[in-house]
């Protein structure tokens, strides 16, 4: 039986995913499957192939994400897989499109003598990729604030949490998948405007790409 941790930054990103997976909120910002919650009382069969799924809402930004994910990992059994789901901006990727992140960089990291965006401590390892040609694989840069302009010209995504998740997954040796829906092309005004559109706002459709068993 596989233990899967899904990570979202905001409740508005997480709530419909939790509903579709039939997860219960057991404490603020933490949801678990009923089977996971009642496993001991029901003497749940450990050979069952279904996954135990937990959903954690970390808050926005790399710092909050690092703090809340670290607390979770210290207090709970290590997951077999972490899946990060959320919105991302992009230089040129179509709004409303799902992408699978192949690698993530720290957007603010610029230290003399070191490669820009790449922390020697880790966090920029390659992520797990879905075996699905329908979803594009792209790199992502994690910033501590909303990116509205950039010198980066490549076909990439921008978020505010993934590098912290990746760094901790590398430290704890946990496989990481990240699926991002493009919410804007580096425009904060368009971000809020686009999220009014159902096909952009909804995130639960990403579950169709995942095998959670």
What are these regions (language model features)?
Residues 1-5, 14, 51-53, 80:
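Extreme N-terminal starter segment of soluble prokaryotic enzymes
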Residues 35-213:
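Glycine-rich phosphate- or other oxyanion-binding loops that anchor nucleotides, phosphorylated ligands
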Residues 27-30, 47-49:
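Short, ordered beta-strand-loop transition motifs
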Residues 4-24, 29:
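N-terminal beta1-alpha1 ligand-phosphate binding loop
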């Amino acid at each position: 039986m596989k233990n899967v941790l899904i990570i979202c930054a905001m409740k508005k990103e997480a709530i419909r995913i939790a509903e579709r997976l039939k997860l219960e909120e057991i404490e603020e910002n933490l949801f678990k499957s009923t089977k996971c919650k009642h496993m001991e009382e029901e003497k749940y069969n450990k050979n069952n192939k279904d996954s135990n799924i937990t959903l954690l809402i970390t808050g926005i930004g790399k710092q909050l994400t690092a703090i809340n994910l670290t607390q979770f990992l210290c207090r709970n059994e290590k997951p077999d897989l972490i899946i990060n789901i959320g919105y991302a901006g992009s230089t040129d990727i179509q709004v409303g499109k799902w992408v699978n992140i192949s690698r993530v960089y720290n957007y603010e990291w610029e230290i003399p003598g070191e490669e820009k965006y790449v922390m020697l401590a880790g966090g920029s390892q390659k992520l797990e990729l879905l075996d699905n040609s329908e979803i594009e694989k792209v790199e992502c840069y994690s910033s501590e604030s909303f990116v509205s302009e950039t010198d980066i010209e490549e076909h990439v995504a921008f978020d505010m949490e993934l590098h912290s998740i990746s760094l901790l997954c590398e430290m704890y040796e946990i496989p990481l998948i990240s699926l991002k829906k493009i919410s804007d092309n580096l425009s904060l005004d368009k971000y809020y405007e686009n999220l009014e559109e159902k096909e952009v706002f909804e995130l639960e459709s990403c579950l169709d790409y995942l095998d959670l068993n």
